[in-house]
A protein has these predicted regions:
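Hydrophobic, regular-secondary-structure patches
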Residues: 22, 26-100, 107-110, 124, ...
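Beta-strand-rich non-transmembrane domains
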Residues: 92-97, 118-129, 152-175
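A hydrophobic alpha-helix feature that marks transmembrane segments and, especially
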Residues: 22-26, 296-305
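Short beta-strand boundary microenvironments
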Residues: 98-146
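Mechanotransmission and gating elements of multispan inner-membrane complexes involved in transport
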Residues: 160-161, 169-296
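Short, strongly hydrophobic transmembrane alpha-helices
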Residues: 7-31
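A short amphipathic helical element positioned immediately N-terminal to and/or at the very start
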Residues: 1-2
Length: 305
């Protein structure tokens, strides 16, 4: 008798699970669709290097790990020079303690309607503003520090992690911005190794630092200290190498001045010769959701069988 009761209870549980699973899956998909589409619809255009449009959109909107092919600041300058849209460059390549570091400009905060809940906004290179969830999970507040994670911890010759000063915490926005660490573009370029600060060689008398020293030129060796923290004391020593127009980014938002300008801007990227693409995030995410719903229909059919 006891065995029959257990068998009956197990059968009822299985039937209940089978009946509930499609409903639970539908609720999950509906919530995911709302979250994905709301952010995509609010973002008019994304510009990036040709490749996977989905990778470009997912990294730019949701800061996922899959980094698209990189573009350059020259591509951003072309958008600005067109006078058809406001470019908002984004460099979302690096992480800090598992959260994406998003290098951008102050226009991003205005565009997303992000507000500071505690502390202040970005003002200097090396500063960071944290999304609400990041601050809560890592238990950080203005005045604390957050160190960037190396791309490859086993690369001993790689770029040193940067110790960033936390200066502000964003109010909760219920979006992927809550899960991001925001910094100035120059900060992310320093993390990438395009800029650095070091001891003043002209004032330093330590002979062990020099490979060669003449009246005109100074060549330092590996003993020269590279700063991994930016402060008021060493801020002036930080400088960048190379052509700024060739500095790399993961993408740029493009906010048209009006619908007609948006159409004209898209037309400039139709040519097959250009290495840059411009996409409408809503179209890309809608295509992704259609594929997901097709898979869901297959699962429903299997459950029914």
């Amino acid at each position: 008798v006891c065995f029959n009761k257990i068998k009956t209870a197990t059968l009822i549980a299985c039937i209940t699970l089978i009946a509930f699973l499609p409903l639970a899956l539908q609720l999950l998909l509906d919530e995911s669709e709302q979250q994905l589409m709301s952010r995509a619809v609010s973002t008019p255009l994304i510009v990036g290097t040709k490749g996977s449009a989905l990778d470009l959109v997912m990294n730019t909107l949701y800061f996922v790990d899959e980094v698209p092919e990189l573009m350059t600041m020259a591509d951003v300058d072309r958008i600005e020079d067109s006078h058809l849209a406001l470019p908002i460059p984004i460099h979302a390549k690096f992480q800090a303690r598992g959260y994406p570091i998003v290098g951008t400009t102050m226009d991003y905060f205005d565009f997303r309607g992000l507000a500071i809940a505690n502390g202040r906004s970005l003002a200097l290179v090396g500063e960071a503003v944290l999304g609400a969830t990041v601050a809560n999970e890592l238990e950080l507040k203005p005045g604390d520090f957050l160190v960037s994670s190396p791309e490859n911890p086993f690369d001993l010759a790689g770029v040193y992690p940067l110790k960033m000063h936390v200066v502000g915490i964003l109010a909760k926005s219920h979006s992927s911005d809550d899960l991001a660490v925001f910094a100035d573009l120059k900060t992310t370029w320093i993390i990438e190794g395009l800029g650095h600060g070091h001891q003043d060689l002209l004032k330093n008398q330590d002979a062990s630092l020099f490979l060669d020293r003449t009246k005109k030129d100074i060549t330092a060796n590996a003993k020269l200290r590279l700063y991994t923290e930016i402060s008021e004391i060493n801020l002036d020593s930080f400088h960048f190498h190379g052509d700024r127009s060739q500095y790399r980014l993961t993408a740029s938002l493009a906010v048209p001045t009006d619908p007609k300008s948006g159409t004209l801007l898209r037309g400039r990227y139709v040519s097959q010769e250009t290495l840059i693409q411009i996409v409408q995030p809503a179209e890309v995410i809608d295509g992704l959701l259609q594929n997901i719903f097709q898979i869901k229909n297959v699962i429903d059919a299997i459950i029914v069988l």
